């Protein structure tokens, strides 16, 4: 069970994962050691799964963000998702209900790279029965922060 202090620590780290335990402790009026122990416990429980930099793909030359809706053979969903999660181009992957069996977000350098990615890595998967691609025109908000 999370208490008020745990939630405050999570909110602070959610906004700035580089903030030191000392800074967090000062902000909350608790010791650095208390913060360290709580973060360790939250990590061991799987609540904190990592600390990541938020990177703008366009500034690194990745111009294409594609949303792929995948139709997968029902008996092969788990196996196929495990293969897809290993692809570097896929930055988010979800098993879904509704029209698609899975939805993923892929980031690529350009349209040519997208075509190559689909032809060489997605379409050859024998368990993928089809794929609908939607290109992102602009990003107004990404999902990198939790609403806590």
Swiss-Prot record:
Q: Which InterPro entries match?
A: ArsR-like_HTH (IPR011991), AsnC-type_HTH_dom (IPR000485), Dimeric_a/b-barrel (IPR011008), Tscrpt_reg_AsnC-like (IPR019888), Tscrpt_reg_AsnC/Lrp_C (IPR019887), Tscrpt_reg_HTH_AsnC-type_CS (IPR019885), WH-like_DNA-bd_sf (IPR036388), WH_DNA-bd_sf (IPR036390)
> Which positions make up the DNA-binding region?
21-40
Determine if DNA-binding is one of this entry's keywords.
Answer: yes
The HTH asnC-type domain extends over: 2-63
Annotated Pfam families: AsnC_trans_reg, HTH_24
Which gene name does the record give?
A: ptr1
Know the name of this protein?
A: HTH-type transcriptional regulator Ptr1
Question: Oligomeric state and partners?
Answer: Homodimer.
Question: Which keywords belong to this entry?
Answer: Activator, DNA-binding, Repressor, Transcription, Transcription regulation
GO MF term list: sequence-specific DNA binding
Protein's job: Participates in positive as well as negative regulation of transcription. Binds to its own promoter.
